[in-house]
Swiss-Prot record:
This is Large ribosomal subunit protein eL8. There is a cross-link at K101, K150, K178, K298 (Glycyl lysine isopeptide (Lys-Gly) (interchain with G-Cter in SUMO2)). SUPFAM superfamilies: L30e-like. PANTHER family: RIBOSOMAL PROTEIN L7AE FAMILY MEMBER (PTHR23105). GO terms for cellular component: cytoplasm; ribonucleoprotein complex; ribosome.
Amino acid sequence: MSSYRLGYCMKEERHNLVLCLWSQSPGILNSKCLWPFTNIHLLVGALPREGAGGAWGGGRSEQLPTCSTTHHDFTWDKKVVNPLFEKRPKNFGIGQDIQPKRDLTRFVKWPRYIRLQRQRAILYKRLKVPPAINQFTQVLDRQTATQLLKLAHKYRPETKQEKKQRLLARAEKKAAGKGDVPTKRPPVLRAGVNTVTTLVENKKAQLVVIAHDVDPIELVVFLPALCRKMGVPYCILKGKARLCRLVHRKTCTTVAFTQVNSEDKGALAKLVEAIRTNYNDRYDEIRRHWGGNVLGPKSVARIAKLEKAKAKELATKLG
């Protein structure tokens, strides 16, 4: 099989520049480095393999051919076009060719729940949101939230299956004649607005955790003020789904710690201290901050255009 010596020249019309690159490998034809270049003239010559002393035998190196840089030394082959193939340019006007694929996300008719949550998010930005509702945007930081959920995971209430197994084991023990000794109820999380409200009013809750995305928000809008009045530390956690997983429910708005084991009292005290600093002690500051009142890009552009016209008119009057 004969080896190929490949040389290709690229000429730039304006600067009369010729780039010459020589290679002994035919694989250079498929090299991606050639793709960006246009007007490349390929010169491929089949040269017979030389002996042991030739250019490929490791002996003396043969002088490679050179490519002249003058304009008239080589000719450029014109692209051969078959006249039988006619050009049929597409017309994307109305009622003409099929339109190309475009991103039509803006025109999709989304499901009702998606439209509602998007409209709600826009309204919360456009309208002036009172402080009582705006306070639910100030959620617990990620590090403290992780520690809180880690502690709360230890005090998850039992599931239906666990309760069934516990009662079954107790019934079997009683049937065997070993006696029925009532056990003390372990400390667990208490969930639900009514339950937590009662615990706060009786000052039995040690820490109250409220979800930030309760819908309707009126269900829990009074809880921060009640907790502050009764001196109970409270915090606002991002995502009611995280609370739902803790207490094995489909929906959950708030949970409360009532009791913890002796080994976890130190961790709970640290959490309560950090949460009290961020929420209870800052209540007067939080209730003064309104939210929303952020205009959209169209309104901002319209106002800027009017201001520019007013400034131009004033400059004309002042002369």
